[in-house]
Structures are given as structure tokens and as C-alpha cells.
Amino acid sequence: MQRYPMTPQGHAALEAELKQLKSIDRPRITASIAEAREHGDLKENAEYHAAREQQGFCEARIRDIEAKLGGAQVIDPTTLPKDGRVIFGVSVVIENMDTEEEKQYKIVGDDEADFKAGKISVNSPIARGLIGKSEGDEARIETPKGVVEYEIMKVIYD
């Protein structure tokens, strides 16, 4: 069984999305399909086909979330030893050694990642290059733009 690392907040967000899909979206789509059926010929009924397609997307997302919750490995970074190492769930301040630009990222699960909000996936090239390193260490990270060198300025266990 595949394991899906996630923060407690990410786990709660997936549970909320699953509840929304099952209790609100699924019944709404079912009602739309029933209403579209009443309009007659299903072969040329665009509303019916659109609702069926929407139903397929909804059911696929439900299955995806259920699989992820079933294999969830909830990691609360506040309970981990605070030894200055970069691990899942921490925020890390890094400095690009060429440009001296500082950025802060929180390392989270795949479903929680939001680059614009400063949350990067544990499976991203940046996170993979930082995990296991400590404050003051340098990391050479292969990015789509080439190799970038960063210095780890601070690790925050939040």
C-alpha cells in the first residue's frame, strides 16, 4: 500500500473535501442527471452528457481521496525533535547563493502544495534537495532552470 505523507491540516482538508463531494456534489450531480433524462432523447442531450461527465470526475476524485486517506501518514512537525534538520512539515528559509535572494518554503504533502503560498511538495526537486540537511548547510538542487545552490538559513518547526 502506498503511503501519503501529509500534515494534520492537509488530512483535515482532504476529509472536508471528501465530505463536500459525498454530501453535496454527488447528490447535486445525480439530480442534474435525473432532470436531464426527463428532457427525452439521451443521444443528443448535451445536459445529460455534461452531467454524466461531471459525475465521472466527481467519482474519480472521491476514489482518489479515499485512497490517499487510507494510506495517509499524518506527520505533525511540532512533535518531532527540533534539531535544525530539514524534514517533512517544517518551514525552511533558504538563500540563493548566486542572487542572495531569500525564500521561505513549507514542505508539505502533494495535495497541500501551493507554490504561490510558499508550500512545496515533499516530492519536489527543492524539497528532495533540502531534506536531511541542517541549518548552515549548502544544497545543490537540480531545477528546470539548471543547478541552483542554496544555503539553509533557518529551519522552523511550525
From Swiss-Prot:
GO biological process terms on file: DNA-templated transcription elongation; regulation of DNA-templated transcription elongation
UniProt-recorded Gene Ontology molecular function terms: DNA binding; RNA polymerase binding
InterPro entries xref list: GreA/GreB_C_sf, TF_GreA/GreB_CS, Tscrpt_elong_fac_GreA, Tscrpt_elong_fac_GreA/B, Tscrpt_elong_fac_GreA/B_C, Tscrpt_elong_fac_GreA/B_fam, Tscrpt_elong_fac_GreA/B_N, Tscrpt_elong_fac_GreA/B_N_sf
Keywords: DNA-binding, Transcription, Transcription regulation
Functional note: Necessary for efficient RNA polymerase transcription elongation past template-encoded arresting sites. The arresting sites in DNA have the property of trapping a certain fraction of elongating RNA polymerases that pass through, resulting in locked ternary complexes. Cleavage of the nascent transcript by cleavage factors such as GreA or GreB allows the resumption of elongation from the new 3'terminus. GreA releases sequences of 2 to 3 nucleotides.
Family: Belongs to the GreA/GreB family.
HAMAP family xrefs: GreA_GreB (MF_00105)
Database matches in NCBIfam families: greA, PRK00226.1-2, PRK00226.1-4, PRK00226.1-5
Protein's name in the database: Transcription elongation factor GreA
Gene name for this UniProt entry: greA
